[in-house]
Amino acid sequence: MPVDLPIRQIYGVLFTPDGRILLRIEKGICQLTGGKPEPWEPLKETLSREALEEANCRIDKIHTVGYQKVDDGEKVYAQLRFAALIREIGPAEPDPDRPGWTYGRILVSPERAIKLFPYGDISEPLIQAAIKIAKKYDFYHQENLPDEVLNDEILED
């Protein structure tokens, strides 16, 4: 956890029990689920809330992967990254923070997630670090993936 930077954003690499990653699709761009922590909210609860609001999924086994220092030219802050296990995925629903807006969702292999991310050079190290954490806490078992899991699965309403 950063000690000298405010945490302004929290994102999660959300794994299904079969080892895929859930990506949120906004305007054709695949991203991690997450958002801004509320001042009163524990950081892990921010990710749980955002996962429910943006992707209608319930998560647990939330563990810190690390953080990225961001300098947007006006402020310097941290984006915290977690790995978590998806326990349940419901139908797509509008994000309560953006009335009328429903995100697309897709389940992909970690290798595919790296290719789809708009995060440039940090994409692969981020996913590899998340996998390492998920293995440590026993919720990543990709070595047992059936062939059909290697294909993308777009989640419909």
Language-model regions: role of each:
Residues P37-D60, V65-P125:
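Unchanged
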Residues I29-Q31, E38-P39:
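Short, surface-exposed beta-strand-loop junctions and turns on beta-sheet-rich folds
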Residues K115-D157:
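Charged phosphate-binding loop/patch that engages nucleotide di/tri-phosphates or the phosphate backbone
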Residues M1-Y11:
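Acidic, metal-coordinating catalytic segment for phosphate/diphosphate chemistry
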Residues R24:
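Conserved active-site beta-strand element of glycosyltransferases/polysaccharide synthases
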Residues R20-I21:
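Entry beta-strands of beta-propeller and related beta-repeat scaffolds
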